[in-house]
Regions:
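Long, contiguous binding/interaction regions
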Residues: 1-94
Length: 94
């Protein structure tokens, strides 16, 4: 993902530690939602899933997974973005 914000920009625009919102979009098949949530949990080395919500498109072809974990630093944010980009089935991450 070459369009990631810099750690400096994240530090200027967010308060750490604190919540950060990630969104991944993909097809709702083969455990996509579970893979996205697990990727965030594992990257942040948490024991439980972070808060998340899902929304399917009207036709049901795609699903948006919004995950809102507590992060400690801008570097955590960048690490999660990198991890999400590697999840099978992810089409977009923001």
């Amino acid at each position: 993902m070459d369009h990631l914000p810099s750690a400096e920009l994240l530090d200027r625009t967010h308060e750490f530690p604190g919540p950060y919102t990630f969104k991944a979009i993909g097809r709702p098949e083969g455990g996509f939602v579970a893979r996205v949530v697990a990727a965030v949990r594992e990257e942040l080395e948490k024991d439980v899933d972070p808060p998340y919500r899902i929304r399917e498109t009207a036709a049901g072809r795609h699903v948006a997974v919004t995950v809102e974990p507590q992060v400690q630093s801008a570097w955590d944010v960048l690490a999660v973005y990198q991890r999400l980009a590697q999840v099978a089935g992810v089409m977009f991450v923001f």
